[in-house]
Amino acid sequence: MTTQLEQAWELAKQRFAAVGIDVEEALRQLDRLPVSMHCWQGDDVAGFENREGSLTGGIQSTGNYPGKARNATELRADLEQALRLIPGPKRLNLHAIYLESDTPVARDQIKPEHFKNWVEWAKANRLGLDFNPTCFSHPLSADGFTLSHPDAKIRQFWIDHCKASRRVSAYFGEQLGTPSVMNIWIPDGMKDITVDRLAPRQRLLEALDEVISEKFDPAHHIDAVESKLFGIGAESYTVGSNEFYMGYATSRQTALCLDAGHFHPTEVISDKISAAMLYVPRLLLHVSRPVRWDSDHVVLLDDETQAIASEIVRHNLFDRVHIGLDFFDASINRVAAWVIGTRNMKKALLRALLEPTDQLRQLEASGDYTVRLALLEEQKSLPWQAVWEMYCQRHDTPTGSQWLDSVRTYEKEILSKRS
């Protein structure tokens, strides 16, 4: 440890102690908050099912930065490189299309055995795994409908895919000793004016009930459902709207997924957390950065990321909120994208843990909004960076921007050699 870092740490401890914050306790609490990294940043949501297939479902990955992963071995190597540069507990979030098999596997036939390499890798890297059925980029989703499809046979295919995915998810939890959160998102919707908005939602309701009919130990598997305002090609009507899934999660007591990019640009999910927690047992968060639409830019340490972290910490939702990331930027180094976004999420959590929340809550309750605002602003200037650097040091990860040296070396020696 450098003398400069030690001096900054000691000064930071004193500054935060003056406002009633124990920085050691803040770091202990930060180690209770894993962030689930999403595998699909590493290959632009391509997966291993059909490397020649196109990305569909109203989502889009833009850019053509060289070096994207072409197979599971490369993707895991890239993830390991990123993991080494991010302090604290982490998880990995997989989509069904990241299965491994020597022969083609239909999506309704996926099994735990197709993900055994991921489980062994997760064990070696001390990671939990989360999961998602992939209800897009498939011939049977080409017309824009999956679980709400009017054709019963096609609808059943997607029901069976989701049921098979739940078994994979439960396998993850059983093998790794930590529950896998499996999130269901479907692209179902219509481009233009829709006459019958009810029938697809009725079909979706019945399909979801069939999907979750098999019971699993919640210590191994947790169901989550995710809404969206619109997607490309589904601008006018989305079957799985916010109201639909809020009602579903409340009535079925599943987890509800809130994606930062899945609402109107003037809405923020930080404001939805406390409302939803009154009705659902758990929340899954997809922290992202929408730029004018659900563009899935890399997460910044911006006001909304900070507000999301603050809501989790202020209301002590550590055991009820699962933090995941969801962005995919193909215009920059993909390993760097993981590192930037995940470190920013963890920085936001640390800053929230360093807030004198009890004092601020008392001021609010007494109606002293002037001092509340003043202290919230003064809090931003306290030396949280020194606490962050100590956290990085204790987890043997680079401080500051030093991690870039490792990424540049990896790009030169590994990524640049991929065609």
Swiss-Prot record:
What cofactor does this protein call for?
Answer: Mn(2+)
Top-level EC class: isomerase
Where is the protein found, in the record's own terms?
A: Cytoplasm
Disulfide connectivity for this sequence is none
Tell me how the cofactor is bound: Binds 1 Mn(2+) ion per subunit.
The protein's Enzyme Commission number: 5.3.1.14
Entry binding sites for Mn(2+): 262, 294, 296
Task: Give GO terms: molecular function aspect only.
Answer: L-rhamnose isomerase activity; manganese ion binding
Q: Which Pfam families match?
A: RhaA (PF06134)
Picking any one GO biological process from the record gives:
rhamnose catabolic process
Keyword Isomerase assigned to the entry: answer is yes
Q: Which SUPFAM superfamilies match?
A: Xylose isomerase-like
Q: Which keywords fit this entry according to its UniProt record?
A: Cytoplasm, Isomerase, Manganese, Metal-binding, Rhamnose metabolism
According to UniProt, the reaction catalysed is: L-rhamnopyranose = L-rhamnulose
Q: Hey, which pathway is this one from? A: Carbohydrate degradation; L-rhamnose degradation; glycerone phosphate from L-rhamnose: step 1/3
Supply the InterPro entries for this chain: L-rhamnose_isomerase (IPR050337), Rhamnose_isomerase (IPR009308), Xyl_isomerase-like_sf (IPR036237)
GO CC entries: cytoplasm
The reply on keyword Cytoplasm is: yes
State the protein's purpose.
Catalyzes the interconversion of L-rhamnose and L-rhamnulose.
Q: Which HAMAP family match?
A: RhaA
* Family per similarity comment: Belongs to the rhamnose isomerase family.
Note the subunit structure: Homotetramer.
Protein's recorded name: L-rhamnose isomerase
State the organism named in the record.
Salmonella gallinarum (strain 287/91 / NCTC 13346)
